[in-house]
C-alpha cells in the first residue's frame, strides 16, 4: 500500500475541491484497453477496482494512472522486415528504396502488434487537499511527466506548482553529512552519494557503510557535494533524499507497521486504515522536511502578498 517514491508538487492549502468534482474531471480520460494495433495507451483507473476513479478519506484522495504498452522488440521487427524485403527484391529484381523499406517496416509492425505481449503498469497519485500536496509514486522522471501530463489534461487550470524551499537540498545534505546529524527529528543513515561538480563528475557512493566524519570532510573539502542521502524521520520512516526533492525508497519502520488497525475486518477496512495511516504519517514527515529546508517559499510569497 505504501508509496515507494514521492515526486512532490504543491497545491493551494487548503484546496477546496470535492472528490465528486475530481471524479467528473477524470471520467472523460478513464483508461480504455488499447486495440490490437495501438502500441500504448493510458488513462485513469479505479484505485479499488469498484468503478470509482477517486478514493477519498479525511480530505485525502488516491488516483491511479494506468498505462498499457505492447512489447514488440525492434530486433524482431527488423528481422521480419529484412526477410520480407529479400522476398520482394527476388520478385521484382532490384533492391527496395528507402521509402519502400520504411513502408514495409510499418506494415510489418502493424501485422505483429496484435500478437505482441502487453504489459500494464499502475502509478498511484496522492492528493492532500488539506495541506496542499500532490504526490506521484514514481521513481522515473519520465513516468512522472506522463502522469502530470494527464492530470493537466484532465483537470482544467490545475493549480500545480513545484516545491520551492529556502535551502538547497544539496547544500543541506552536504552540511548534514559534514556535521554527522540532521535537524528536526531526522537522522542520517548509512547510504550516501557524493559527486564533484567539476569536469568528470567524480562520484563516491556509500551503501550500508558508516559515514565517518573524517571521510566526509575529506570528500567535501575536495569539492564534492552530497547528491543522495539516506535518512530516517522520527524513527518511523526511512527514505533517500535527492537534489530535486524527489524522495525515494520510502519504507515504513516497525513502529508504524505495529500501528495498523487490528480491528479491520475485511479488505476494504484494511485499505481505509492503511490509507489513513500512510497519508497521516507522510503528511507530517513532509511538513517537517520542508521546515528543516528553510520553509516553503510559496507559503512565504502568499503571506507577503496577503500582508
UniProtKB/Swiss-Prot annotation:
It holds the Pfam family RdgC. It is found in: Cytoplasm, Nucleoid. Keywords: Cytoplasm, DNA recombination. GO terms for cellular component: bacterial nucleoid; cytoplasm. One of its GO terms (biological process) is regulation of DNA recombination. InterPro entries: RdgC. GO terms for molecular function: double-stranded DNA binding. The keyword Acetylation does not apply. It comes from the Bacteria. May be involved in recombination. HAMAP family: RdgC (MF_00194). Belongs to the RdgC family. This is Recombination-associated protein RdgC.
Amino acid at each position: 500500500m505504501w508509496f515507494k517514491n514521492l515526486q512532490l508538487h504543491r497545491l493551494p492549502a487548503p484546496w477546496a475541491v470535492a472528490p465528486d468534482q475530481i471524479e467528473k474531471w477524470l471520467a472523460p480520460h478513464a483508461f480504455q484497453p488499447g486495440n490490437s494495433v495501438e502500441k500504448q495507451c493510458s488513462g485513469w483507473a479505479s484505485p479499488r477496482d469498484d468503478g470509482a476513479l477517486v478514493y477519498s478519506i479525511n480530505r485525502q484522495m488516491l488516483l491511479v494512472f494506468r498505462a498499457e504498452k505492447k512489447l514488440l522488440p525492434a530486433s524482431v521487427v527488423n528481422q521480419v522486415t529484412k526477410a520480407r524485403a529479400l522476398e520482394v527484391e527476388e520478385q521484382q529484381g532490384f533492391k527496395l528504396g528507402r521509402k519502400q523499406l520504411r513502408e514495409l517496416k510499418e506494415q510489418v509492425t502493424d501485422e505483429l502488434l496484435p500478437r505482441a505481449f502487453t504489459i500494464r503498469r499502475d502509478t498511484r497519485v496522492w492528493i492532500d487537499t488539506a495541506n496542499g500536496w500532490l504526490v506521484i509514486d514514481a521513481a522515473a522522471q519520465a513516468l512522472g511527466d506522463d502522469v502530470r501530463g494527464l492530470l493537466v489534461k484532465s483537470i482544467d487550470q490545475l493549480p500545480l506548482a513545484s516545491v520551492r524551499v529556502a535551502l538547497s537540498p544539496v547544500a543541506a545534505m552536504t552540511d548534514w553529512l559534514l556535521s554527522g546529524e540532521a535537524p528536526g527529528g531526522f537522522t542520517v543513515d548509512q547510504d550516501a552519494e557524493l559527486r564533484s561538480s567539476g569536469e568528470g563528475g567524480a562520484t563516491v557512493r556509500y551503501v550500508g557503510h558508516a559515514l565517518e566524519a573524517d571521510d566526509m570532510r575529506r570528500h567535501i573539502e575536495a569539492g564534492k557535494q552530497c547528491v543522495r542521502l539516506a535518512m530516517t524521520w522520527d524513527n518511523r520512516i526511512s527514505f533517500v533524499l535527492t537534489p530535486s526533492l524527489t524522495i525515494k525508497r520510502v519504507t515504513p519502520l516497525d513502529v508504524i507497521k505495529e500501528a495498523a488497525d487490528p480491528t479491520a475486518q475485511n479488505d476494504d477496512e484494511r485499505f481505509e486504515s492503511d490509507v489513513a495511516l500512510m497519508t497521516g504519517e507522510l503528511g507530517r514527515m513532509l511538513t517537517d522536511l520542508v521546515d528543516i529546508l528553510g520553509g516553503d517559499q510559496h507559503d512565504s510569497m502568499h503571506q507577503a502578498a496577503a500582508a
